[in-house]
A protein has these predicted regions:
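Periplasmic/cell-envelope proteins involved in peptidoglycan metabolism and beta-lactam response
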Residues: 1-176, 183, 192, 267-275, ...
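Beta-lactam-recognizing serine transpeptidase/beta-lactamase-like catalytic domain environment
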Residues: 60, 155-196, 202-424, 441-443
Length: 443
């Protein structure tokens, strides 16, 4: 009798072990089977080391990459291929955030019931939100300079342009050892760069909401070209003379913003970098942007002043700054970006700034264009912008231009960075104009 009991217990233990193992396998199968299916050793979906199923289109239906043949067939135009290389990707997965890498499971068409089987055997189509013609315009506008252009619809979240340079031809990719630095990075998504004066839009938001309105209205600063804090010189490009809050932003006066940063304080500046989404990573159909990083030393007024100007240890992700531009355009809330044209609905961000703050920033950004950049340089565009000239050790400044246009049919925010170049409005501004003119006027 005892033997039977022992055998029953042993069988029960074995059954529990079997059930536990089976449960663990089912759990992992449900959770991870999509990644198992798209491993390189799966000959059903890979051929000669590259994906052998699925096609990638842009938002207008232009075929960007066809994986279904013996080799990957890309769009015919070389410039278009290079303008969209980091967005579309290549057969070898050099760009981890590209469609060929990030949307591999969609291209394969995997699901739990049928696996990778499809009636056609050709996988699925993926339609990106980018417009390849806009990307080509951005690529040509950047020329041979390193940089990036990002444009998105601040009402729907659709990213219509994300172009990075230097780039490569996915039909004939270079050896990774010989490629220029940044070639295989989508800088719009994965980059972190010193922002320079475009960060003053964050400092301005903090000033509006943290400094009493009566004091901010009376704010005045006499710029002589050099402002000293604790024996350290903070320089401007020129002596701006007497400036108020609005004038300080229009003239991008470092001295004035150093003083504003001191009044706001390190803790509040840090809080607003977070509130404005600059330390946020957004889920864009499964692709995540890099987080920006910022330091605001509590007991170091000099470093806090530099940080509020957009220097010191400020490192900005362009995608997150673009979303903040959307918040200013949208009365304080923005829309999470999307990389797929087929992605329906919209996901709003949390409120970044008050609606009244957004309205005031819009007014100030419009004043920037009128007073400093020249509306005639952006003909036909109702543009709101801030330039930036970020000092980078060992090279010329990085030129920035960020903002949005107010147009019922074309509600787009933009960000441009031209590395190792010069002044923001003089270098990055014309790039933004060329891209926006093409979007609005097709020319």
């Amino acid at each position: 009798m005892r033997k039977l009991e022992h055998r029953a217990v042993l069988l029960l233990i074995l059954a529990l072990i079997l059930f536990s193992g089976l449960s663990f396998f089912v759990f992992r199968y449900v959770r991870e089977s999509d990644s198992w299916a798209i491993k390189y050793y799966n000959s059903h979906v890979f051929r000669n080391g590259h994906l052998a199923t699925g096609r990638v289109f842009d938002r207008k239906g232009t075929l960007m990459a066809d994986n279904t043949g013996k080799t990957i067939k890309y769009v015919d135009d070389t410039t278009t291929r290079m303008a969209t290389a980091q967005a579309v990707g290549d057969g070898y997965g050099f760009v981890s955030t590209s469609a060929e890498s990030a949307f591999r499971d969609r291209l394969v068409g995997y699901n739990l019931l049928t696996g990778t089987y499809s009636i056609s055997g050709l996988g699925n189509d993926v339609r990106l939100s980018i417009d390849s013609d806009v990307c080509r315009t951005a690529y040509n506008a950047l020329g041979y300079r390193s940089g990036l252009v990002g444009v998105y619809n601040y009402k729907t979240g659709q990213v219509i342009c994300m172009t990075s340079t230097p780039s490569f031809d996915p039909a004939d990719p270079p050896d990774t050892k010989n490629a220029k630095s940044g070639t295989f990075m989508n800088k719009f998504i994965s980059g972190n760069l010193t922002p320079g004066s475009i960060f003053k839009l964050v400092t301005s938001a903090a000033a509006i909401e943290k400094i009493p309105a009566s004091k901010l209205k009376k704010f005045s600063f006499r710029c002589t070209g050099v402002h000293e804090i604790d024996g350290v010189s903070i320089r401007c490009t020129q002596a701006h003379g007497e400036v108020d809050f609005e004038g300080a932003l229009a003239k991008s006066c470092n001295g004035a913003f150093a003083e504003l940063s001191r009044k706001i304080g390190a803790r509040s500046l840090s809080a607003y970098a977070q509130k404005c989404g600059l330390e946020t990573t957004y889920d864009m159909n499964g692709v995540h942007n890099a987080k920006g990083t910022f330091e605001f030393p509590v007991n170091d007024e000099v470093s806090t002043a530099w940080a509020g100007i957009g220097q010191w240890k400020d490192y900005l992700n362009p995608c997150s700054m673009l979303v903040y531009m959307g918040a200013i355009a949208n009365d304080g809330k923005s829309v999470v970006p999307k990389l797929l044209a087929t992605s329906t609905g919209r996901r709003d961000t949390r409120r970044m700034i008050k609606a009244s703050t957004a309205r005031r920033l819009r007014k100030m950004m419009k004043n920037n264009v009128k007073v400093s950049y020249g509306e005639n340089n952006y003909p036909g565009l109702d543009i709101y912008a801030k330039s930036g000239t970020a000092e980078v050790e060992g090279q010329r400044p990085n030129a920035w231009f960020a903002g949005f246009i107010k147009n019922k049919n074309y509600p787009y925010a933009f960000i441009v960075c031209v590395e190792d170049s010069g002044f923001g409005s003089q270098v990055a501004g014309p790039v933004a104009n060329l891209v926006l003119q093409y979007i609005v006027n097709g020319e």
